[in-house]
Amino acid sequence: MSIAAIILAAGRGSRAGSLQNGPKQYRFLGREPVICHTIRCFLQHPAITNIILVIHPDDYQICANAIADLKDHLTIIEGGETRQISTLQGLRALKNVKPNYVHIHDGARPFIGNELLEQIHTSINHKEGILPVLSVSDTLKYVSNTHHVLETIPRTNLYRAQTPQCFPFELILAAHEKAMQSHKQDFTDDSAIAEWFGIPIRTIPGDPNNIKITWPADLETARSYLLKGMQIFPDIRTGNGYDVHSFEDGHYITLCGIKIPFEKKLNGHSDADVALHALTDALLATQGAGDIGTHFPPSDPQWKNASSEIFLHHAIEIIKKAEGRIANVDITLIAEKPKIGPYRHIMTENLMKILKISTDRISIKATTNEKLGFIGREEGIAALATATVIYPGEIPK
């Protein structure tokens, strides 16, 4: 008995996050992308003889990078505009192999338990499809277009379908070909096509851990599940930043985006916010992304008198693109004058709004230089900043 698997990874759904971070199947889950976990579930099962990975035409490079160590163990083909077309492409790619049975699986389900595969394999026969299902526990409501409840749907005999769904190969191929010839393309899964074609579908108990990553919260759930029973080192990075500016004649200085009345101002190309400059460098350091001068050269006139919050937002966007989460920032201001204490609260509140973290994760403190050096002579202010950012995955071994 030969069993093949088709893994569908051609989707372009954006519900699990912005596509600027890549399709969900290539987002990191632990030390490798979601799709790698999915592939390994089938590779590690001895009964699976062939694996077809169906990807989006634009994803050949990102896929090659993601599955570099696995690509020799499967066949990669180009999918179509819909899930149904992609499945048919995968089935056609197996026509020369002619397996007895074929699994059809969502690439965004990375936790297929070996027990579930075994249960499917002991249940398969040449006449039926096998569908893992979970009972519906929530109360179901039928809602109108105006968001009003029309009726409550009884939960009896209602189930949620999972993948992998397993079918006799020749039957499911014929069903998909017939659906395409009939221009029937409104099916949401393969068991629905099988039902329409007349293939009996037998259900077996699904696995609650076999989640599909659809929404942003699902990625966090998946990461938590992966951590269970595993001793790994999360990818927590720390960056440091330092900046200094001299005084010149003026009426206020800007620190952490807050204007503080003073008989002088800080001299600089931008608004010379020494605190935000140091913090921006600290955040950039967690991505190895250079320093503030790399991104905003002081020789560029467009940054003359610019708000340093622009620089900070830029660093935050770089972190967001890498799916990082700012966990903590610590800023030390070194100055004889002015007194920072009266403004610490409002400075912290401003950083809270910019960084989108709670105030207990923000530390702003000040010290003098004990009358030593240029700071002791009241010629300027220096700032030290440390930032801690958590990124998905773990420290590479």
UniProtKB/Swiss-Prot annotation:
Q: Where is this region: 2-C-methyl-D-erythritol 4-phosphate cytidylyltransferase?
A: 1-236
> PROSITE patterns attached here?
ISPF (PS01350)
Site-annotated residues for Transition state stabilizer: R15, K24, H269, T368
Q: Which residues of the sequence carry a binding annotation for 4-CDP-2-C-methyl-D-erythritol 2-phosphate? A: D243, V244, H245, H269, S270, D291, I292, G293, T367, T368, N369, E370, F374, R377
EC assignment: the record states 2.7.7.60, 4.6.1.12
For the region 2-C-methyl-D-erythritol 2,4-cyclodiphosphate synthase, what residue ranges are annotated?
237-397
List the residue(s) that the UniProt entry marks as the site Positions MEP for the nucleophilic attack. R155, K212
Q: Which reaction does it catalyse?
A: 2-C-methyl-D-erythritol 4-phosphate + CTP + H(+) = 4-CDP-2-C-methyl-D-erythritol + diphosphate; 4-CDP-2-C-methyl-D-erythritol 2-phosphate = 2-C-methyl-D-erythritol 2,4-cyclic diphosphate + CMP
Q: Name one GO molecular function term.
A: 2-C-methyl-D-erythritol 4-phosphate cytidylyltransferase activity
The record's InterPro entries line, in alphabetical order, gives: IspD, IspD/F, IspD/TarI, MECDP_synthase, MECDP_synthase_CS, MECDP_synthase_sf, Nucleotide-diphossugar_trans
Q: Which cofactor does it need?
A: a divalent metal cation
CDD domains from the UniProt entry: CDP-ME_synthetase, MECDP_synthase
The biological pathway it contributes to is: Isoprenoid biosynthesis; isopentenyl diphosphate biosynthesis via DXP pathway; isopentenyl diphosphate from 1-deoxy-D-xylulose 5-phosphate: step 2/6; Isoprenoid biosynthesis; isopentenyl diphosphate biosynthesis via DXP pathway; isopentenyl diphosphate from 1-deoxy-D-xylulose 5-phosphate: step 4/6
Cysteine-cysteine disulfides: none
Q: Which PANTHER family match?
A: 2-C-METHYL-D-ERYTHRITOL 2,4-CYCLODIPHOSPHATE SYNTHASE, CHLOROPLASTIC
Q: Which NCBIfam families match?
A: ispD (TIGR00453), ispF (TIGR00151), PRK09382.1 (NF006899)
So what does this one do? Bifunctional enzyme that catalyzes the formation of 4-diphosphocytidyl-2-C-methyl-D-erythritol from CTP and 2-C-methyl-D-erythritol 4-phosphate (MEP) (IspD), and catalyzes the conversion of 4-diphosphocytidyl-2-C-methyl-D-erythritol 2-phosphate (CDP-ME2P) to 2-C-methyl-D-erythritol 2,4-cyclodiphosphate (ME-CPP) with a corresponding release of cytidine 5-monophosphate (CMP) (IspF).
Protein's UniProt name: Bifunctional enzyme IspD/IspF
Q: Which species? A: Bartonella bacilliformis (strain ATCC 35685 / KC583 / Herrer 020/F12,63)
Lineage start: Bacteria, Pseudomonadati, Pseudomonadota, Alphaproteobacteria, Hyphomicrobiales
